[in-house]
Amino acid sequence: MEEKKETAQMTQETTPKDSRVIEGVRRSSRRSHAEPHSPKKAYEVRDRRQKRSLERDQHEDGTPIKRARLPREQSSTRKHPIVLLSREIPEYHTETMPTPKKNYKLIPEQVTELSEYEIERLNNIKENAKFLQSLKLLETASSLRSPPKKQNQTRGIKREKQTKVERQPIIRRSMRLQRIDPSGAPLPNVIQPPEPLLEEHPVKPPGPLEMVPTNLKGDCISVEEFLKTWASTSKESLRSLKKQPSKDFKRYTACLQTMTLREETVAKVVQNRIFSVAIHPSESRTIVAAGDKWGQIGLWDLADLSGNDGVYVFEPHSRPISCMSFSPVNSAQLFSLSYDGTVRCGDVCRSVFDEVYRDEQDSFSSFDYLSADCSVLIVSHWDSYLSVVDCRTPGTSCEQRASLNMRSARTTSVHPVNRDLCVVAGAGDVCIFDVRQLKKKAQPVLSLTGHSKSVASAYFSPVTGNRILTTCADDYIRVYDSSSLCSEAPLLTAFRHNNNTGRWLTRFRAVWDPKQESCFVVGSMARPRQIEVYNESGKLEHSFWDSEHLGSVCSINAMHPTRNLLVGGNSSGRLHVFHD
């Protein structure tokens, strides 16, 4: 007992006065490694263990030690819980004991002792947190973040949101045996004929249609002002058309470098994919037109700053408008041709779309002016027919119709000097016909060879007609010499060009520039998106591109006849106007 008292006094001297002692003892059922074999030794071992346990659970004066069990979730196992043994703390320890931290709760009978290492670790954590807070890293990171990029505001008409159609659940039972329809009504005994299906885009009625915009509701003042502007600019354009095209090629290429695209010269003009583009020949006012997939014609006056951004949408057709042109003689008239089998003339002076030619049993593909005064048209049909239409005669029929020895007729172009000749592009062949020899089964005067796939377009050069430009699906653009059409038209240039637009883009159609008939413009599949200008030798003269405002493929393009102005239309109904 004296030895135990001495060891207790030594432990009290080494233990700091300002700390409380909590001992954790895990009850264990471990047996000793050396088990006695005799019963007498076994009893002696048992007595020694009981004596040690009694001494461990009592104070020196014989009072029992209070026990505190940890909660079940804090104990490692249910079989061996951790027991905290707390000794009664003398009175002189409470005065010198340090105040506990906020995160620790002091139990009257239990106090957790922290080692010097743990106290130093907590102090280091606090100092590191204060140091990181003094650096202000979060404020610096938030200030370095770039501001959100401003989105370009969409000009013109807005995209219509399609309403979602909720589908009714399918009832898994026999309606036929119950003699009821899907709505639950009893079926009649007499079988009635099915009701005709309503078309989403019905065919327009025959006869003239009024020029009433579909994107404006009740705003008659702006419509009247636009029509007056169109009529007044048409009178001025007659003088500008008399100018001859420029012969200075260096000056022409220099002007191409000055043409740029701006945010205010991009607008959505129609709702769907653009199939044709036309430019008003006025030099004082910029008016462009676009025809889309479902018969809409969008007219855009770039100088009009009204609430509709100068965009006026009309619906004279019900199917794709594949060809459209302002009359070279009277620019107050806009001719349009559609797949629905109609050719109409939009007369701004009378505010109507007159019907020039109608054939409901057939589908039209293209047209051109056969006479110099633009009173006679030649129309190509998809099923390989040519029709001659005189706009001066009453009615909506044609004067002459001939079947071509071709699989189809996609485009037709009249020779600008010898107007009895026209070139027709079809499915794999390009032929030149003499209109005077058109019969029920017309034979071509000349055929242009070398095309291995379908030809999208073929056009005479706009001034002399000495060149023929073709765009083919075999990824080639070809230029033929048509100065002498007696025996053959030799191939001058054939260069590779990616014409594989796919299903959802309008096919490329390379067209001549009226200001420089040795150059032509065509869309491109290259990135960044661009519109390309080539000369007749196949050399790339210039590429129009703008990474900020031009982000799509412009399949259909057109050049102004006298001004440095280019218009490109894409498959979402937008027009992009490049000008100096």
Swiss-Prot record:
Database matches in Pfam families: WD40
WD repeat ranges per the UniProt record: 269-310, 316-356, 359-399, 404-443, 450-490, 500-544, 548-580
Disordered: annotated span: 1-82, 142-165
GO MF term list: DNA binding
Membrane-crossing segments per the record: none
Keyword hit for Repeat: yes
Keywords assigned by UniProt, alphabetized: Repeat, WD repeat
GO biological process, one term: regulation of DNA damage checkpoint
Entries under SMART domains matching the protein: WD40
GO cellular-component term (any): nucleus
Domain of life assignment: Eukaryota
Annotated Polar residues bias: 142-155
Gene3D superfamilies: YVTN repeat-like/Quinoprotein amine dehydrogenase
Family: Belongs to the WD repeat DDB2/WDR76 family.
Name used for this protein in its record: WD repeat-containing protein 76
Originating organism: Xenopus laevis (African clawed frog)
